[in-house]
Structures are given as structure tokens and as C-alpha cells.
Amino acid sequence: MSAVESHRRWDCFRILFEGPIGALDLDKTWWVYGELDQLAGTLALSDPKFAQYLPRAYDYWFTHLVDKEYGEVWNNVDGRTHAPVRQAPKQWEWKNAYHSFEHALIGYIVGQQLNDQPITLYYAFSSVEVARAALPYFYSGVIKGIAVNQGQPLQKVTFGNVH
């Protein structure tokens, strides 16, 4: 059993330049957990056995990485205490405007599909004809319906069978 498996943590890794055999870094980095959550979710869409990892991974994310008082996600969590490391700002444009949003979007899509629920996304395409080619982010899926609000360039697209 590897050190990672024995600690049952996804983001433990060896730092090869510390000591003769390396050192185990137990700290949690938001980006690593976010990407691995998304990977496990994406894999679960193709092979349901990967869904078993999602409750534990998302529980850690919401319990320890999300700042419940002020919002957003801590950059790092101390692996021994599970307390946030407050040494850097929580926010910058590529983190909040991209990665945090993407984590939420993929979590929504995967959760809905695994629970056999419709996936509803909103688009601002120039026409309904263009909306007919919409995809649920970088996944494939079947469009179950398109609704348009009169006078608004907004299409509500409902998907199923996302993979």
C-alpha cells in the first residue's frame, strides 16, 4: 500500500528534494482538490464505480475548504488540523471567475446526471437555432428541451444522458 493510499488522501505527494526518501505533504490545496473532484465526477459519468469517491471528496471540500462566513474557498488547509491557512488572499480573477465556478458547474452536472435528474443550463446565444447545438459544458448530452424568455436573448436548455 502506498503512502497516499494509507493516508486515504488524494493530494498527498512526495517532495523528492527533502530527505533521502522524501517527505509526505499532508496539506490540502484548493486547486488540487477541485480538479480531483471534477475528475472523479467526470469518471463517474462513464463508470459508476467512481461515484463512491464523491461523497467523501465533496464533504471535505464543503467542510474544510469553503469559507462559510465570507464565501469562496480557502487556498490551503493544514493537513494535520484541517484548519484554513490564512496566508494568502482567497480571491483572484482566474480562481474565482474560472476554477471556483467550474467546480460548482461540474458538481451540478455530475450530481444531476448521477441522480437521473434533468440538467438545466442557461445560454445567451444569438438564436434558438444556435442553442440547438449547445453542449453541457465539455460533456456530451441529449437536449431534452429549449425554452426562450420573450424579449430576452436567453435560452434555458435542459439536457439528459450527459456523459
Show where each model-derived region lies.
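Glycan-recognition and catalytic cores of secretory/periplasmic carbohydrate-active enzymes
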Residues: 1-163
